[in-house]
Amino acid sequence: MPVDFNGYWKMLSNENFEEYLRALDVNVALRKIANLLKPDKEIVQDGDHMIIRTLSTFRNYIMDFQVGKEFEEDLTGIDDRKCMTTVSWDGDKLQCVQKGEKEGRGWTQWIEGDELHLEMRAEGVTCKQVFKKVH
């Protein structure tokens, strides 16, 4: 049985986010705005089907996918690229590989207690975010 990621999560910390955005070639103005945001995550999980909504006052991003199946991800509003994305289970963690223009792009997501941990990677840069479950 996979881990239950269902819930609404509020951001607690966001380490190295601006450097991560720089690695994605996000322009300086958007990096500064994005770095000030404290987005929430809303995750709806039905077995291996997941919808992850990243919600902020500036912009929302919705990722709808089936674990284990490659799909084209449109990152308009983030770095305006498209990539071929696969999310897989690695024990109790979700591992995402995003194949495209940027080397080593992807993320890992897992739960510790009532916290959601997310590590995002691109071009050798890692950003670490932590969220607390509120419901």
Swiss-Prot record:
InterPro entries: Calycin, CRBP1, Fatty_acid-bd, ILBP, Lipocln_cytosolic_FA-bd_dom. CDD domains: CRBP1 (cd19462). GO terms for cellular component: cell body; cytosol; lipid droplet; nucleus. The lineage of its organism: Eukaryota, Metazoa, Chordata, Craniata, Vertebrata. Keywords: Cytoplasm, Lipid droplet, Retinol-binding, Transport, Vitamin A. All-trans-retinol binds at K41, M63, Q109. GO terms for biological process: fatty acid transport; lipid homeostasis; lipid storage; maintenance of location in cell; regulation of granulocyte differentiation; response to benzoic acid; response to retinoic acid; response to vitamin A. It comes from the Eukaryota. It holds the Pfam family Lipocalin. One of its GO terms (molecular function) is fatty acid binding. This is Retinol-binding protein 1. It is found in: Cytoplasm; Lipid droplet. Cytoplasmic retinol-binding protein. Accepts retinol from the transport protein STRA6, and thereby contributes to retinol uptake, storage and retinoid homeostasis. The keyword tRNA processing does not apply. Residues 22-32 are annotated as: Important for interaction with STRA6. Belongs to the calycin superfamily. Fatty-acid binding protein (FABP) family. Interacts (only as retinol-free apoprotein) with STRA6. Forms a beta-barrel structure that accommodates hydrophobic ligands in its interior.
